[in-house]
C-alpha cells in the first residue's frame, strides 16, 4: 500500500471512531405505565436505552418509517436499547400498555 492509501485508510478509521465518540446515549424510563418524557430529540447515531422501572413487563416498539423496531417483552430492572441511524420522527409505543406513547425526533 502506498502512502496515499495508508493516509486514506487512516482518515477513514478516524472518521468512524469520531462518529462513535460523538454518539450519545439517552435514557428513557418506564414507570407507572408511562414514559418518563413525551418527546425526545436525538441525533443520527445516538442510542436510546429504555429502562423498565415498573413491577411488570413492557414491550416497546415502533412501526415508523424512520426506525421500525420491536424490543420484545422485558421486566422490571431490565433495559433494551435502540440506535437511530436515520433522521425523521419515530413514534414509540408499548404493546402491553397502549396509552404509553413517546415521539423521538431524530436530527442530522
Regions found by a protein language model. Give the residues of each.
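Extracytoplasmic copper-binding redox domains, predominantly the cupredoxin/blue-copper superfamily
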Residues: 2-108
Amino acid at each position: 500500500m502506498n502512502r496515499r492509501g495508508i493516509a486514506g485508510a487512516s482518515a477513514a478509521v478516524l472518521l468512524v471512531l469520531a462518529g462513535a465518540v460523538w454518539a450519545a446515549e439517552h435514557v428513557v424510563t418506564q414507570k407507572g405505565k408511562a414514559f418518563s418524557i413525551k418527546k425526545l430529540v436525538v441525533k443520527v447515531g445516538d442510542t436510546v436505552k429504555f429502562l423498565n422501572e415498573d413491577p411488570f413487563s413492557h414491550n416497546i416498539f415502533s412501526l415508523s418509517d424512520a426506525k421500525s423496531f420491536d424490543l420484545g417483552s422485558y421486566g422490571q430492572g431490565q433495559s433494551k436499547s435502540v440506535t437511530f441511524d436515520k433522521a425523521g420522527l419515530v413514534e414509540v409505543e408499548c404493546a402491553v400498555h397502549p396509552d404509553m406513547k413517546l415521539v423521538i425526533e431524530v436530527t442530522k
